[in-house]
């Protein structure tokens, strides 16, 4: 019998269309695994997003993707439908018929005529009653009075989809009608209530999956949640889903087929990895934006550096950052600054900027590898025993051992923690005026820094997020306890690790949100900085021309040569070091301007003895006029920017990173934060976090990279 991919099911060919009895070129599947890793990570993410948005998920047993699982889990049945491959029906029926035939012939099979686990020495001929008892004793979970101990409905939907996919392959001995019933529950958005805890994911996710079986068999303690959030009894759930014929009386092996699988752990892992892949790309793009607003040197993305390191994740991360920075208006402006007094500045940027490709690259490789591992798992047959109709036998093994889930989730969580650590280091530099190349302390955007502490609370929150994230990076899989009378003496803890990784993803989203809003604040501050610097230069130039050019009798004055050096002072001084009180004698602007005039006076020689040619005599007049004019001009420039009419437009509009800024500022309507407003940072973070959780950030993120050709810039 052929499945939806044209491959014959159950014992005749494997999932890649190869005869099990035939010698193949890739018998160990290493080639298939390697082939799955070809192409760029970004292209893979784009493909995931496209699959996620398709309205139909067609199940045939062997082609399910993590993005399809994420779509079913997240969209609650609205806009996406599950369809079963009719071609799989015959294979499923064949294995179900084989179980009944073998039972009638007196064949001794685990879980069909025997007890379970460490008590498999017991025997019975009451196959149906045995399955009923299996579901009863596995209903050992605790829900309590609220939802704290209930598996999230999204994860339950993911588990239902994955379990259907596994059972469709026809090695499990279950009726097709049961799979159709679960599909109806999914399509009608009716979700069984599963306990959050209680599984060690070997022998499969027995306890939580038994509650799906409990709903199918009408157990009185089973419950479901309907489309509107109303709690449903089994009778109500069946009626609402349109499942006819009443509750199922499980035949031999069917209960075991339902519960003895890794679907809960791998389903949640699929959800986690869909988000983790997107967050990894976001971290790459935000690292590039960080370089822009920090006036970083783009040399750190040079392809030769990364080519010589050989790691593909690093090479791609650097190429993505290089693409964002190539032609960036910020990079062009920063280059001019770096050329000014180069020997007095650090030769290279700090590690959080300069080594971000080297840091992120391995994390992307880990996340990508984990994605492929989980994708193999959700397309695997993972129960026991396996029914091989072609050889007329039940094979007793251990595919229920969810080690790929536990290991991949531990690794993913460590990668997520590393991404968060980099993000925290970058954010810490961004808000610190000792490191951020002229941005104000705490990214304070108001006029009075004594009454505006900007992102100080956000930095404290980021430290909290990062600390918890680093704690979560600790592995789960080394905490295995021997279970079930020492029969399950090693077990994967797959769902526990998936749950912890889900928590880690949520924290990374909190950090990504905070950092992204901080970057947008920095972009706006650079815009303000540019407008204010232009205003200060124009004002200093105007006053210099008026005061320093001519003498009292209209003759040219020696001080006319000071203007160029005065403007150089403005160029060299950080605007936010003095702009709250630009004419203060304790701030660097007035001090350096006076110092410049004094130096010119000292070089003026004998002219200083003459009042009409003395530069020193001009200093007080210059300062007085500047004090009278500059504060007004600065306030006027601020007001113009706040009203949307700045003299100089925002550089971000000329950059490839603009779509993310536009999304945060214009589409979500977040504000430039200052102590002069009532709006708190958390209110703005909330807008971005909710949008990020809904996946709304995906399109602007990918728009930043839509013109990237998938390769580094050529080395010429």
UniProtKB/Swiss-Prot annotation:
Keyword Cytoplasm: yes
Post-translational modification as stated in the protein's UniProt record: Contains an active site 4-methylidene-imidazol-5-one (MIO), which is formed autocatalytically by cyclization and dehydration of residues Ala-Ser-Gly.
Catalytic reactions on record: L-phenylalanine = (E)-cinnamate + NH4(+)
Residue numbers of 2,3-didehydroalanine (Ser) PTMs: 203
EC supergroup of this enzyme: lyase
Gene3D superfamilies recorded: Fumarase/aspartase (Central domain) (1.20.200.10), Fumarase/aspartase (N-terminal domain) (1.10.275.10), Phenylalanine ammonia-lyase 1, domain 3 (1.10.274.20)
EC number: 4.3.1.24
Biological processes per GO annotation: cinnamic acid biosynthetic process; L-phenylalanine catabolic process
Binding site for (E)-cinnamate: 260, 348, 354, 384, 456, 484, 487
CDD domains: PAL-HAL
GO molecular function per UniProt: amino acid binding; phenylalanine ammonia-lyase activity
Any Gene Ontology CC annotation: cytoplasm
Subcellular localization, as worded in the UniProt entry: Cytoplasm
InterPro entries listed in its UniProt record: Aromatic_Lyase, Fumarase/histidase_N, L-Aspartase-like, Phe/His_NH3-lyase_AS, Phe_NH3-lyase, Phe_NH3-lyase_shielding_dom_sf
Pathway info: Phenylpropanoid metabolism; trans-cinnamate biosynthesis; trans-cinnamate from L-phenylalanine: step 1/1
Cross-link 5-imidazolinone (Ala-Gly): where in chain: 202-204
UniProtKB keywords: Cytoplasm, Lyase, Phenylalanine catabolism, Phenylpropanoid metabolism
Keyword Cytoplasm: yes
Subunit relationships: Homotetramer.
Function: This is a key enzyme of plant metabolism catalyzing the first reaction in the biosynthesis from L-phenylalanine of a wide variety of natural products based on the phenylpropane skeleton.
PANTHER family: HISTIDINE AMMONIA-LYASE
Family: Belongs to the PAL/histidase family.
Designated name of the protein: Phenylalanine ammonia-lyase 1
